């Protein structure tokens, strides 16, 4: 049976893990790292770079490098490169394709099944878009799992049968979640979840960037925000400074040649940022995590003292101010240090993949829907059918009626959120139920059913009880992609995968050819050098000329893009090189009798096996 992987598709970094002998293993990528930057770049030569290579060239290719696309998932955002528009799903799919490739390389087999994690507070459109990204990448998405739930699964599975309450505080690169879970006897149950989809480490980086821009403007009068390349360098320096301030009290930010003044003189940026100053300029961001924490405690109906363990997830939780705040909020409870905040979510996803594949037994994962779901009723009111923090999968029905006499149809508008007025919430989609027989208002019976599957994706049905007519919608308008568009993107991704394979093959062939040309040229030059030194070449000039011709053909082929021509030229050069080697060997053999006759009897040409010993050392040993 083919194995399934667990993928943490993060804002700044992504991780893939797989079960090996029942234990989760984080897979290192082709660059040797266990985390892959969620960065995609379109090089000007047509190559698509993903991960660290994409991040490395960001400064010189700002407009064609995309990062933190997770913040746009589930929206109508797109980016145009070379007259082609790319959606967040397509960019995310590039990252997933790399993770898939790296996992396949590690396992030595094809991977099609995956469990992908999302922030607990992701709405339906964002979940649907994440699933579509998986499909575009050629993955069969077995399940969409909430990140804190996956983390709790990874943390709590081996904690015995005693029931425990775990708080997961998840601050990633672009999103924040806090969840309360109960674990015991193989059951992982989410009690409550809350969060902010637009709060993460990127926001802390942005504050440092703003601070640096203001400092530089104050000293030089130049506004760096107008220089894209300078801003990219500032972002990279800000991320590095943030990381350094987690272990140091201050850090030096030094960027030579950041820009030039009016007289074209180069200017340097050199600033010292202390941890205290960093915490001051980001205090309001930290404070935004308090309300979701308090909401979760309230929704779960427990007190802070009931929490047994605190698990920190996401690289941003390494900031000392975050750790201190969590300790303060939990009444001094020390966060668990036994999990890697960057990897624990992928590990949990791999375990859930194992559960779905039957590799992990006796584990039940009970997740919740993070936001209430309902429809708009008379007066623009949001009538909730499913309350937030309801365990999923779930199904709820409610009967409604018409607002006007002889109303022939009803418009069902589906919303997600907590506001009392429907329009203040997120509109997921709408559809119409037609063919209602003429009747006074209040008489027709319209049954509306909400069905949320285990991925947290919503299906809504409206049925006229009188006629039996019904209409169903699978909410996907929020993602903005039709089945045809997804199919097109899948084909596009497959085509690019083939392009990438060809490009890698082309690079390998080109490198081999260049290496062969260099080595052969060097060898021919040595032979001619020996002849000019008076020793005489052991090879006829005619043979060397043939090699020269083959080298020239190979060089000419390398100037073009025809790989078959390069291969053909390389084969020809290989044949001539072998002929050259054979000629040298034969010439050397021919010289042997003459060279050996000075040394005595013909019988002396027996070969003796012996070690070479240094003469002086030999004398000392005698």
Swiss-Prot record:
Expression induction or repression: By stress conditions e.g. heat shock.
Domain of life: Bacteria
Gene Ontology molecular-function annotations: ATP binding; ATP-dependent protein folding chaperone; unfolded protein binding
Span list, region Disordered: 584-622
Phosphothreonine: modified positions: 175
Acidic residues bias spans: 606-615
Pfam families xref list: HSP70
GO biological process per UniProt: protein localization to plasma membrane
NCBIfam families: PRK00290.1, prok_dnaK
Protein family according to the UniProt entry: Belongs to the heat shock protein 70 family.
Biological role: Acts as a chaperone.
Name this polypeptide is given: Chaperone protein DnaK
Organism encoding this protein: Mycolicibacterium smegmatis (strain ATCC 700084 / mc(2)155) (Mycobacterium smegmatis)
